[in-house]
C-alpha cells in the first residue's frame, strides 16, 4: 500500500517492513553489497524499487525542569528523536537545479574523467564545475549532467538522499516574574506575572538541508 511520495521515493505499508517505510529507487549492488558500476564508472540503478529507510525512531525522550526562586520562575524542555531516517527531498531538488553548495564547487581533473550520459570526458588538468566521484569503477566527473539526472532529486534513485535524521531540540524555555503582593493590591488583582518564552531555539542534528521534523 503506497501512502504518498514521488516516482523515485515514497512511503509504503508493506508486510514485514516498518510502518510507513521509505520505499524507492536504489543503486544496484552485488552479493557483497558493493555498488555495481557501468563501463564509465557511474553507478547502475537497481531494476526494482526497495525499502531504503525507516522513518520510525528507535526512541523519543524529553527532559525538562521547572525552577522557582522568590518571584522568578524559570523552565526549559529538551526533546530528542533518535534512530529515524528521512528522505532529503530539498537537497535533491537543489542538486537538480545546480544550486546546492556541493554543485557550486570547482574541481581539477587528475585524469580524463568520464561525463555522465556522454562519450566526452573532462580532460586531465582542466578545471570544471562539480565534484569527482568514485563508486569503485574509477574516477568520474560529477558535473551538472549528473546532478540533473540520477545524481539529483528528480532522478531514479532516492537512496542517496536518505540519511539519519536523529535530532535534539531545545523545545521551550520560559522566564517569568510574578508580581509582588503590594503591586497586586494596587492593581486590585489576585495574581499576575510577566515573562518571555521561546520555542525551538536550538537544534542539534547531522541531517542536512532542513529541520528533520518537517517534511522534505
Annotated model-derived regions:
Residues 1, 70, 81-85, 180, ...:
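Structural signature of outer-membrane beta-barrel domains
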Residues 1-11, 91-100, 207-216:
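Flexible, surface-exposed loop regions and adjacent strand-edge segments
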Residues 21, 34, 83-188, 192-193:
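Extracytoplasmic gating/loop element in the C-terminal half of outer-membrane beta-barrel translocons
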Residues 26, 64-66, 174-178, 197:
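Outer-membrane beta-barrel architecture
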Residues 59-65, 72, 170-175:
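Hydrophobic, lipid-facing positions within transmembrane beta-strands of outer-membrane proteins
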Residues 71-76, 182-183:
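Repeated loop/turn-to-beta-strand initiation elements of outer-membrane beta-barrel proteins
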Residues 76, 194-196:
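Membrane-embedded beta-strand positions of outer-membrane beta-barrel proteins
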Amino acid at each position: 500500500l503506497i501512502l504518498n511520495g514521488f516516482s523515485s521515493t515514497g512511503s509504503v505499508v508493506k508486510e514485514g517492513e516498518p510502518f510507513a517505510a521509505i520505499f524507492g529507487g536504489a543503486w544496484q549492488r552485488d552479493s557483497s553489497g558493493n555498488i555495481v558500476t557501468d563501463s564509465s564508472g557511474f553507478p547502475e540503478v537497481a531494476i526494482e524499487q526497495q525499502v531504503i529507510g525507516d522513518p520510525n525512531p528507535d526512541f523519543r525522550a524529553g527532559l525538562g525542569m521547572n525552577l522557582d526562586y522568590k518571584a522568578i520562575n524559570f523552565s526549559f524542555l529538551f526533546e530528542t528523536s533518535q534512530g529515524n531516517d528521512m528522505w532529503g527531498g530539498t537537497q535533491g531538488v537543489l542538486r537538480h537545479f545546480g544550486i546546492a553548495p556541493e554543485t557550486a564547487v570547482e574541481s581539477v581533473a587528475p585524469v580524463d574523467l568520464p561525463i555522465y550520459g556522454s562519450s566526452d570526458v573532462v580532460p586531465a588538468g582542466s578545471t570544471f564545475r562539480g565534484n569527482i566521484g568514485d563508486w569503485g569503477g574509477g574516477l568520474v566527473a560529477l558535473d551538472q549532467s549528473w546532478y540533473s539526472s540520477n545524481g539529483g532529486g528528480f532522478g531514479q534513485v532516492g537512496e542517496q538522499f536518505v540519511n539519519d535524521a536523529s535530532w535534539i531540540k531545545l523545545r521551550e524555555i520560559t522566564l517569568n516574574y510574578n508580581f509582588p503582593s503590594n503591586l497586586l493590591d494596587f492593581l486590585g488583582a489576585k495574581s499576575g506575572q510577566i515573562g518571555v518564552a521561546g520555542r525551538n531555539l536550538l537544534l542539534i542534528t547531522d541531517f542536512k538541508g532542513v529541520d528533520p521534523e518537517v517534511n522534505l
